[in-house]
Amino acid sequence: MHNMFPALTKTLSLQGYKIINSQTGSAAWSCGRRWFSSDKDDHDDVVTRIKIAPIKRTNEPLDKKRARLIYQSRKRGILETDLLLSGFAAKYLKKMNEEELEEYDSLLNELDWDIYYWATKNFKTSPLPDKWANSKLLKQLQEFSENKEKEILSMPDLSKYQ
């Protein structure tokens, strides 16, 4: 596999990326959160995902955790998810207990588009994993995403998180 793309392999290795040998034996490499493959027979319904292990935080004070989750809710990289999660966090984060904060933290470690599709109940595009099937937090996010008040979504002012 490394002989197929020697210059690319060296470049990606220098940047900390890994070339992964998929089940088909094709070369794959990451550019952000999207994967590219050398296999010309890839089907659109076959998704190769990147999984980066989240940083293990131990004994993180709740005020620091809330501040981090606010930041992570507001700065996702995809506008739709930024707007959805920032509004959700502004409304609910201050009321969450430690267990709910842990669950929300875990949700934020998922891919942006997956979060968006799960929140908008678009399971055909991104199937809901069993891990989230009975999540009260995800159900609350889905309800929030319905925008029953028909408000125009915008990034909440930081004072809304207090």
Curated annotation (Swiss-Prot):
The keyword Lipid metabolism does not apply. Keywords: Chaperone, Mitochondrion, Transit peptide. InterPro entries: SDH, SDH_sf, SDHAF2. The keyword Transit peptide applies. Pfam families: Sdh5. Changing W113A: Loss of covalent FAD in SDH1. One of its GO terms (cellular component) is mitochondrial matrix. It comes from the Eukaryota. SUPFAM superfamilies: YgfY-like. Disruption phenotype: Respiratory deficient phenotype: viable on glucose medium, but is inviable on non-fermentable carbon sources such as glycerol. Cells lack SDH activity due to a complete loss of FAD cofactor attachment of SDH1. GO terms for biological process: ascospore formation; mitochondrial electron transport, succinate to ubiquinone; mitochondrial respiratory chain complex II assembly; protein flavinylation; protein-FAD linkage; tricarboxylic acid cycle. Residues 1-35 form a transit peptide. It is found in: Mitochondrion matrix. Present with 1080 molecules/cell in log phase SD medium. Interacts with SDH1 within the SDH catalytic dimer. Belongs to the SDHAF2 family. Plays an essential role in the assembly of succinate dehydrogenase (SDH), an enzyme complex (also referred to as respiratory complex II) that is a component of both the tricarboxylic acid (TCA) cycle and the mitochondrial electron transport chain, and which couples the oxidation of succinate to fumarate with the reduction of ubiquinone (coenzyme Q) to ubiquinol. Required for flavinylation (covalent attachment of FAD) of the flavoprotein subunit SDH1 of the SDH catalytic dimer. This is Succinate dehydrogenase assembly factor 2, mitochondrial. It comes from Saccharomyces cerevisiae (strain ATCC 204508 / S288c) (Baker's yeast).
